[in-house]
Structures are given as C-alpha cells and as structure tokens.
Amino acid sequence: MKNMVQRFLKYVTIDTKSDHESESFPSTKSQFDLAKLLVEELKALGLEDAVMDENCYVMATLPSNCNTDKTIPTIGFIAHMDTSPDMSGKDVKPQMVENYDGQDIVLNQEKNIILSPTDFPDLKNYVGKTLITTDGTTLLGADNKAGIAEIISALEYLVQNPEVQHGTIKVAFTPDEEVGHGADRFDVEKFGADFAYTIDGGEIGELEYENFNAAGVKILVHGRNIHPGTAKNRMVNSMEIAMELHAMLPENQKPQYTEGYEGFFLLTGIRGDVEETKCGYIIRDHCKNKFEEKKSLIKNAVDFLNGKYGEGTINLTVTDNYFNMKEKIEPVMHIVETARTAMEEVGVTPIIKPIRGGTDGARLSFMGLPCPNIFTGGHNFHGKYEYICVESMYKATEVILKIIELYSK
C-alpha cells in the first residue's frame, strides 16, 4: 500500500473532465488516457485479463486463491475515472500538507485562496494528519481517483501477500459518472460479480446504500417578440413566463434549504430572450412518492401556464435519470452489514447516511448488481477547496481488504 499516494498523485495530473454537452461516449477522449494507464498497471500486477473496451470501461479479475469447498462470493470494487465538469481538472498541482496544524491552509497566495477551518470545520478532524489539497486553480480529483488508487493498492497487497486467502475479485473503472452516464454501457454479465461496492464516498466512515431518485427537466418557453413601442396586448415575453413558472415551485425546496432526506428542485440553467427561453432543472428526492409528486407539481404548473398563455407556450420534457438503490440493497443487506463490520474491525466508525446525489452503484443496483458506496476520505468535491486525508485513504484500502477477508472465511 506504500505506493498509494504516488499512484493518486499521478492519476490526478491526467485531465479526465467529462462534458455534459458532448454527444460522444465517453464524453471526452482524455478519459482513455487514464484508462490505458490503469490497464497497464493492472497487468503489471498480474491481472492478465485487464482490458479497456471501446467505451472506455476498464475491467480486470484477481482469481481466487482459496482452497475450500465453501462457496465464496465474487466481489466487485468500482470507481470512476472522470472528474466533474464543474471546475477545471487540467494541470492539477496537488499540494501536500504534512502534520496539519489545524490552521488556515494557503492554497494560492497570489489569488488569496484559503482553505480555512472557519469555512470547512471538518478540517479540525485532521490535525496531525497529512492532507492533499489543490493549488486553488483546479479541483483535485479525489472524486474519484482516490477510489481508483485505493482499489489498486488493495489488489497490490493481495498480489504481494499470496498467503492471504481471498475469493475472486473483480474491479472496474468507469467513464462519465459525473455526467450521469457511468453505467450506460457497463456490461454487468461480463463483469461477473455477485455484488459490488463503489469506492466513491466522502469522509472516512461513510457507508451508503440510499440515494436520491433523480430526474432531469427541460423547459422551452415560446414568446412573441414585438417592437416595444407597439407591443401593447401583443408582446409575450418568454423570460417572464419562465420566471413565473419558477416562482410556482416551492421556495423551501431548493438545495440551499434542504438536508438529510429532504428533496429539492434546482434550476441548473436559464438562457433566453423575449422570443424564446430555455430552462433546465433537476428534481431529487429519496422518497419515491415525493419524487413523483415533485414531477407532477412541475407538470401541473406548466399545464396551468399553457392554459393561461395558450397551448404550446411551454414545452416540458421530464427524464428519469436514476432511482434510490435502497429497494435493491435491502434484500441483500449482508453486503452493508459486512462493510459495517469491516470498518469497525479496522478502527473506523461507520457513518451510515443517505447519499444526497447518486453513484454508478445506484444504477448498477437496478441492473442486477447490488452496489452500496464506501468512503474515499475526500472532502469538498467538485471545486478548488477539495482535499483528502492520506490516512483516510489507507483506511479505505484496509476496509476493502477486510471485506474481502470476511467473505473468504
């Protein structure tokens, strides 16, 4: 496991930012650069079947070394290669902060960018630890390159210590998770695991098997542009209708006012003029009934405004993206309980809470591969304040190894 940090630092220098607007798969060609490197590393470890397919999915197998009549499940571990489109992942310059003293960390002196425990109180949990931060100009990429490094380090340990008994282990690294397409072309049958874990969580101890139900909404508002000097009773301003629609959504159901199991509507983009306005929303809720109610609410608002301004004034498209994996995990709760036990046995306190987002595992669970989520040790994903604790990374690898051990007994 001693090579874990070096691996991680190498991975984050490869720009794998995905792209919401791209129509190709994967959405950016640069993801192939990391995928090719990972195949080389896996083969160097002796995983001879390591392969990258035409869609940029990397898969590999560590065969069982157990001599037993007991049926040992085939376990998968999964992480994604892309980084968020929300901020640049190019020319990442990670900074090491050893023996953190609990004070402000200057990420970028020239731009006065400070990582402060005043703004991010979780930093206080890492006094005396080693942190890896950004230089304030990019994200870090711990989401999810830390997960990749932790999985490969676990494989390296097993290869270098053949006396450690283990069943068949499958690993996969996926593209385009950050733009919601990580599971689109994932071949569950080819992967061949009985169940899996995504190593894609945040702070040390996170163990998650509930996530949002998610939908995307596209709104197109048609107006009528008339010279403002002669516009009386004739002009229809599409931007104002879009504003009216937005005002009909519950004010208290926005991300900035919600937490825990509370769902929300989020206006993700708006662009327009008098003649035409386009809006994008996302809808999220853990509860399936409340999720459906939210979709109905926005549909009813559109119907009302079409009645007010004329049929066809607003075009609405609602697309379900993924669903809460809880219903697929509960029948096989032993995979959560084993992960909980593994954490406790390596000295990590489990933090079981709902994901306020989604993972590849959410969709994979509905594709026949139950797949809860385990921490990486990172914080503040998707932005310049992202950081990760090295000691937490080692613990993540220990948890992976302990899960493997518990299932091989």
Curated annotation (Swiss-Prot):
Keywords: Aminopeptidase, Cytoplasm, Hydrolase, Metal-binding, Metalloprotease, Protease, Zinc. Zn(2+) 1 binds at residues 80, 143, 200. One of its GO terms (cellular component) is cytosol. The keyword Zinc applies. Its EC number is 3.4.11.4. Binds 2 Zn(2+) ions per subunit. Cleaves the N-terminal amino acid of tripeptides. This is Peptidase T. It comes from Alkaliphilus oremlandii (strain OhILAs). The gene is pepT.
